[in-house]
Amino acid sequence: MVELLGIIRIRGWAKAPWYINETLNMLRLRYNFNTMVYPKTSQILGMLNKVSPYITWGEIDPDTLKLLIINRLETVKGDKVSDSYVKEVLKIENIDAMVKQLYEGKIYLHKLDEYFKLPIRLHPPRGGFKGSVKRPYKNKGEFGYRGDKINELMRRMV
């Protein structure tokens, strides 16, 4: 079973050094409130640590991933993702089976460019951020690693 990381960009590009913007572009997080789902690897973790003042991330659970796919993921044509679309293009029975295969490591969401519009665009969080986006999560802020609390934030942003 593969651990999946949900990564959300929470700060803009102005006054960010070029190497931060370049790394965020590699992660496909070009704009505020864009999110991507990646498997937990040492390469990804190194990139996340480099750009941590501009993003927040943590381990995403299957329920939140399913909610994200159903409500915010779009097809290439701009339509919402449905069970019939997943069955037609990916040859997978439904969205539940797709989430299961994502967690088994058989398919990777970030490599499905020809079927979905990536990155996934989110709303700002309902109720606003609970802390400052200029402080780390551990010190009553918002940026950086937050573990499984990323699910709570993503549910407020869907």
Swiss-Prot record:
Pfam families xrefs: Ribosomal_L30 (PF00327)
> Record keywords: Kinase included?
no
Return the GO cellular component terms, semicolon-separated.
Answer: cytosolic large ribosomal subunit
Q: What is the lineage of its organism?
A: Archaea, Thermoproteota, Thermoprotei, Sulfolobales, Sulfolobaceae
What is the superkingdom listed in this entry's lineage? Archaea
UniProt record, GO biological process: maturation of LSU-rRNA from tricistronic rRNA transcript (SSU-rRNA, 5.8S rRNA, LSU-rRNA); translation
Keyword terms = Ribonucleoprotein, Ribosomal protein
HAMAP family reported for this sequence: Ribosomal_uL30_A
Question: What Gene Ontology terms describe what this protein does at the molecular function level?
Answer: RNA binding; structural constituent of ribosome
Assembly with partners or alone: Part of the 50S ribosomal subunit.
- State the name under which the record lists this protein: Large ribosomal subunit protein uL30
**What is the annotated signal peptide range for this record?**
none
- NCBIfam families in the record: PRK06049.1, uL30_arch
Q: Which family does it belong to?
A: Belongs to the universal ribosomal protein uL30 family.
